[in-house]
């Protein structure tokens, strides 16, 4: 909450920066360097056009080593990733771009770019095990289309609005209680998007726009990849039968965001 932000430039100069706004849902913020002009912005690409297997480059300052460049490929798309701050609070869930490009502490906030130099993601998180604290080839980036939408709202001085269905869900599994099959609806908000589409408690959502949803976090991540007002197709199980419904996504009103 307190402290200063200093931006370091490649020519060795520094500048103080002002935080224009931040969004705790995606753990993104927009800052403005004070008294600086003539900066050349990076070119933003489109994460919607990404394909698994294409080459990517991650840039950052892992462990304080400035301007470190690592390479890899897009390992997966729409990977539901949940991360929290050091206290274990403020969990964020987003539909990540997974990459095997080495990402370590200090890479967060740096760009993931394609081979044409376009930013296609913002490096955000890694998966590690108990015996390793650095990269094991499982890195995750916030898709640039989502980041662009968040940044635009913050620059305009708004609280960031995220899409929602208006349902409370829990993971649904096979009889082995291990294999995820979807997100089971426990509660439907009266007058919400899910209610208007005819969804009911007990329904198990298995896909969104044809992309499988294997858990409740996967559903949250998929929805957050869209904007309020988008129309999506929900596939769900009801009494053992597969049904579909068109849902016009609601807005959370910016209640989860923070300026």
List each language-model region with its residue ranges.
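Serine-dependent protease modules
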Residues: 1-177, 190, 217-220, 224, ...
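Conserved PDZ fold ligand-binding element
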Residues: 194-216
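C-terminal tail/sorting-segment detector
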Residues: 246-248
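Short, charged beta-turn/beta-strand-edge "cap" motif at the junction between a beta-strand
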Residues: 62-65, 211-214, 240
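A structural signal for beta-strand boundary/capping segments at domain termini and interdomain linkers
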Residues: 12-14, 231, 242-244
């Amino acid at each position: 909450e307190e402290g200063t932000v200093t931006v370091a430039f490649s020519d060795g100069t520094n500048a103080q920066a002002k935080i224009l706004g931040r969004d705790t849902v995606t753990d993104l913020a927009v800052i403005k360097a004070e008294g600086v002009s003539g900066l050349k912005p990076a070119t933003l690409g489109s994460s919607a056009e990404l394909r698994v297997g294409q080459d990517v480059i991650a840039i950052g300052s892992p462990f304080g080593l400035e301007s470190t460049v690592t390479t890899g490929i897009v390992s997966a798309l729409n990977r539901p990733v949940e991360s929290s701050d050091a206290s274990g609070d403020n969990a964020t869930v987003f539909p990540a771009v997974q990459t095997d490009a080495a990402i370590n502490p200090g890479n967060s906030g740096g760009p993931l770019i394609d081979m044409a130099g376009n930013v296609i993601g913002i490096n955000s998180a890694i998966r590690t095990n108990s015996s390793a604290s650095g990269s094991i080839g499982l890195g995750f980036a916030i898709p640039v289309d989502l980041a662009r939408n968040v940044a635009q709202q913050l620059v305009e001085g708004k609280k960031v609005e995220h899409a929602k269905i208006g349902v409370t869900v829990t993971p649904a599994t096979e009889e082995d209680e291990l294999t995820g099959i979807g997100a089971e609806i426990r509660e439907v908000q009266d007058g919400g998007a899910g209610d208007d589409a005819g969804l009911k408690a007990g329904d198990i959502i298995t896909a969104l726009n044809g992309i499988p949803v294997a858990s409740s976090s996967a559903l949250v991540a998929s929805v957050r990849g869209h904007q309020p007002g988008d129309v999506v197709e929900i596939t769900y199980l009801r009494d053992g039968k597969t049904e579909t419904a068109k849902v016009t996504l609601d807005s959370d009103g910016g209640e989860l965001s923070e300026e």
